[in-house]
Regions:
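Conserved G/P- and acidic residue-centered "switch" motifs that form tight phosphate/ATP-binding loops
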Residues: 96
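Conserved catalytic-core motifs of GNAT/GCN5-like acyltransferases
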Residues: 118-120, 135-153
């Protein structure tokens, strides 16, 4: 059982490993809800390093890493509570990595004074986010590179969660 990992703030030097993890995860894990053409288009969205550098300028990134496996996942959030990313390596799915990363970004959002966390969530990740207390605010189509993919606008209130009626 894979359980040994730690969470730390990401560094610019992590970008190549994050790009690789992103691509491999999308191609392997998201095939259950998206076509091969859709996942290929989505995976290519993270190929440009300059784009990642821009995301780093606007978001706070955290990585999960294991002594034996290296990077096992990453997540990002900004001060307003917008969570741009949460990806876990395909071999570390259902090992607690996503939950630990989510707890880290939620703690960051609370400390930043955000009243809610919002995200655009894939069909594949929707169940995980619902288990964290998120609700679907709407269904949408989001452009990856060439293609428009189905996903969900989701949110979780941090200030008064009891008001978040499903």
């Amino acid at each position: 059982m894979k359980t040994l990992f730690q969470i730390r703030p990401a560094r610019f030097s992590d970008i190549p490993a994050m790009q690789c993890l992103f691509r491999e995860t999308v191609l392997a894990v998201n095939r259950q809800h998206y076509t091969a053409e859709e996942v290929a288009d989505w995976a290519s969205w993270g190929d440009v390093r300059r784009q990642w550098e821009g995301w780093f300028a606007r978001q706070h990134y955290f990585v999960a890493e294991s002594p034996e496996a290296g990077m096992t996942g990453f997540a990002s959030i900004d001060e307003t509570g917008y969570m741009h990313a949460l990806f876990v390596h395909r071999e570390w799915q259902r090992c607690g990595v996503a939950s630990a990363l989510y707890e880290t970004v939620e703690r960051f959002a609370r400390e930043a004074g955000a009243g809610r966390i919002t995200s655009e969530v894939s069909e594949t990740a929707r169940g995980f986010f619902e288990r964290q207390g998120f609700r679907v605010d709407g269904k949408q189509r989001q452009q990856a590179n060439r293609l428009w993919l189905k996903n969900y606008k989701m949110s979780k209130r941090l200030d008064c969660p009891e008001l978040d009626v499903k």
